Amino acid sequence: YRYENGRDLWGDALSRTNISTSVAALTDIDADPVIDRGRVFAIGQGGRMASYELVSGQRLWEINVAGISTPAVVGDWVFVVTDDSRLLCVARTTGKIRWISQLKRWRDEEDKKGAVRWTGPVAAGGRLILVSTEGDLVYINPADGALAASRDMGHRMTLSPVVADNMLYILADDGRLTAYR
């Protein structure tokens, strides 16, 4: 907003208007917007991810995906987890999807029971790092979306990992904080 008069500079909705489902009606946005080199990247649970010009608010591109986890911008790519447990690599300038990697979606894949939710990604050590509500810690190759490594942490995790001072911090839902170098 303009500090001189309190008026909004610009705004937009991240819910899809061309579909009539209960998901499209959701306006909840849990993911923080990411600002990088004059652009804003945002995703909402209502079914839209978009890129905007920071100052004018002009929508530069949009894709029809829903999510609640903050995207990660690395170089020319935006990485984001969707609400159906897909990790997407999206071109920063065009919104074109480079690759999609399907993460574990169900605790019981055969019966499709026990939905798994993912948070992240964060970028560190040349990898994308994500955690899940099933206690999974995964490392993904950002070039192709391939699983590089995984580990069962044994604890439910709903908060995104944090990277600071060459350390990876993971806070489990039971309060257990784990740090890796």
Language model segments and positions:
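Histidine/lysine/aspartate-rich catalytic loop segments that bind and position anionic ligands
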Residues: L88-W106
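Extracytoplasmic beta-rich repeat domains
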Residues: D8-I35, Q58-V74, I100-V122, S150-V163
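Acidic (E/D-rich), amphipathic helical modules within compact regulatory domains
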Residues: R59-L60, T70-A91
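WD40 beta-propeller blade core
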Residues: R7, A50, L88, V138-Y139, ...
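Short loop/turn segments that connect beta-strands within beta-propeller blades
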Residues: R2-N5, E53-S56, R92-T94, N141-G145
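Structural signature of WD-repeat beta-propellers
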Residues: R37, G44-Q45, T82-D83, S132-T133, ...
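Blade-level signature of beta-propeller repeat domains, shared across WD40, Kelch, NHL, RCC1
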Residues: M153-R181
